[in-house]
Each structure stands twice: as C-alpha cells, then as structure tokens.
Design a protein with these regions (language model features):
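Helical scaffold of the NTase/Pol beta-like nucleotidyltransferase catalytic core
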Residues: 1-40, 161, 168
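Conserved catalytic core of two-metal-ion nucleotidyltransferases
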Residues: 80-114
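Catalytic cores of NTP-dependent nucleotidyl/adenyl transfer enzymes across multiple folds
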Residues: 114-169
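Short loop/hinge segments at the start of secondary-structure elements
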Residues: 66-68, 83-84
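Short amphipathic alpha-helices in soluble, non-transmembrane regions
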Residues: 70-78
Length: 169
C-alpha cells in the first residue's frame, strides 16, 4: 500500500523574495568563482498573488554543462540534499532543510537551455496574467481541499503548466 503524502499551501508571503536573495548569496559564497552561473527565483513563490507550497524554488543556470557536477557537489558539501528521484543527467534537483523542513528546492541546469527557459518563462508569463494566476490558484486549492496526494498534486500542476505554457522562448 502506497503512503499518501500530504502537502500544505500558503498564500503569497512577501518574505519569499528576501529568503531567495539570502539563499542566493549563501550559494554564491561557496561556489567556485570560476564557474559562471545565473541564479533565479522560480516557481509559484516567485509570483506575487500565487498560492503555493511554502518551498522556494531556485534555478541555477550553469553556462558550461561540464560544471553541472561541480555545482551539485559544492551544494552537497554545504548541506544540500541530492534527489535522485527528480534528477536527470542534465537536471540535478537538490533540497535544503531549515529547522527540519525542506525550505528550498534547487534545480541545477544548463543556462538558457530548454529547462532553464521553461522555468524562467513560467514565472514571467504567470506574473503578467492575473486570470491565469487565479486559475492556477484555484487548481491548487481544489486539490488541497480534496486531499489529493502530493504525487497527484504535482501531476496536475505539470499538466496545467504544459497546457498553458507550451511555447517557451
């Protein structure tokens, strides 16, 4: 029998951009200076007015794909947890716990690659469309109220994103 993982939702928290900037500063403090990275706040916590799980998503875009492993290893050496489940050969996913709770999810990808552009453009397009924010919020709230599993919640979100953001430039 599969254990049903639950999830919590929060209204937009104005401290999330500050939390992102602080975490970005921490990450930059230990990454080798020779590695060219672009670190951006992604996901619903980057969109004012969006309901989201209270976990800040961060994309680290690496200019040279050969540096993906170095960045991953640097994060690991500084307490970030590698997720083999969400990772692939060109997209590493890591988490950071604060007070025992995952507060940050880090996506290490090729800068300006397809995945990086999808994540960055999702935020950009959502920020500029209040009716779409409402529709996305309604979906998440409905799933939460129906006590959907975290797996089903994630699946429904990905489907919504695919339907509404099929063109990534």
């Amino acid at each position: 029998m599969e254990v049903k993982k639950s999830f919590s939702l929060s209204n937009y928290n104005p401290s999330w951009p500050t939390d992102f900037r602080q975490e970005r500063k921490i990450i930059l403090s230990f990454l080798p200076k020779i590695i060219d990275v672009h670190i951006v706040h992604i996901g619903s916590t980057a969109v004012e007015g969006a309901v989201s799980r209270p976990i800040i998503d961060i994309a680290i875009g690496v200019m040279n794909p050969l540096d993906l492993i170095t960045v991953r290893d640097s994060l690991s050496a500084n307490g970030y947890l590698f997720s083999s489940k969400g990772s692939s050969i060109n997209h590493f996913v890591m988490g950071k716990r604060v007070d025992g709770i995952i507060k940050f999810i880090i996506h290490i990808v090729k800068y300006n690659g397809i995945v990086y552009r999808q994540m960055a453009n999702f935020v950009k397009k959502l920020k500029n469309n209040y009716s779409l924010i409402k529709e996305y919020n309604d979906l998440k709230i409905r799933l939460h109220n129906e006590k959907a599993s975290l797996k089903e919640y994630s699946h429904q979100k990905r489907y919504f994103e695919k339907v509404h953001f099929t063109k990534y430039s």
